[in-house]
């Protein structure tokens, strides 16, 4: 739990950390900036507690803290905004957990409660999660616990295994064969059910690759969470730089 001191500091800078761009446009518009975009639906994901986390699933899946913000427990569609190009490949710009059909009117940065709030923040600065293996995920903490139990059993059988080479690699390739749209041969997304549980883990390629990425909670006019967004690429800014 965050300290009272941390919470007081957070309240003082909270409004500075909101996203000024309309993230929902990734899922309603056909063009952002000068780039055509498309939406990929990767299926429903179960959030049994509504406490959620985001991380690189190949590096920090067992250790990541959940966000202070929560969503109502339930099962929701997960969608990916894709920027398809010949030159740069099919890049995943934004991932959305669609909690309701309502339109967001503000976007609050997801926080876990241990961020360093003493540093000066610029207008475009944000806190987020690190990616070191080119993939991201967003899931419920119950899914995290289920994975820990499953992986502990696997490690008992073979202590030298790792999550990519001995689990996700083959599953990603199989999913790419079954659903090739906007995927390479090695696979770029997977909606994986944790064995013997009702939990599932959506994983997806992280934009341009490794980096540091924010998660935003979208709130509707009633102040209720209507969606959660993982932002990998600022399309308008990023593709201008590539030109």
Specify the residue positions occupied by each region the protein language model found:
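N-terminal domain-onset segments
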Residues: 1-208, 212-243
């Amino acid at each position: 739990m965050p300290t009272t001191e941390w919470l007081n500091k957070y309240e003082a800078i909270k409004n500075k950390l909101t996203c000024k761009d309309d993230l929902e446009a990734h899922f309603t518009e056909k063009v952002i900036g000068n780039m055509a975009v498309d939406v990929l639906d990767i299926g429903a994901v179960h959030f049994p507690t509504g406490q959620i986390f985001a991380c690189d699933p190949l590096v920090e899946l067992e250790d990541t803290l959940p966000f202070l913000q929560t969503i109502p427990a339930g099962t929701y569609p997960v969608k990916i905004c894709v920027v398809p190009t010949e030159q740069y490949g099919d890049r995943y710009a934004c991932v959305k957990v669609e909690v309701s059909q309502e339109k967001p009117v503000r976007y609050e940065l997801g926080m876990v409660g241990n961020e360093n709030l003493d540093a000066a923040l610029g207008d475009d600065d944000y806190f987020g999660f690190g990616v070191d293996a080119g993939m991201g995920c967003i899931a419920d903490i119950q899914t995290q616990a289920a994975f820990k139990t499953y992986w502990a059993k696997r490690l008992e059988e073979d202590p030298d295994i790792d999550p990519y080479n001995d689990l996700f690699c083959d599953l990603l390739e199989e999913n790419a064969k079954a659903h090739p749209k906007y995927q390479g041969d090695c696979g770029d997304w997977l909606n994986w059910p944790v064995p013997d549980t009702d939990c599932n883990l959506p994983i997806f390629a992280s934009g341009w690759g490794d980096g540091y990425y924010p998660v935003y909670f979208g709130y509707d006019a009633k102040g209720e969470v209507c969606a959660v967004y993982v932002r990998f690429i600022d399309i308008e800014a990023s593709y201008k730089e590539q030109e």
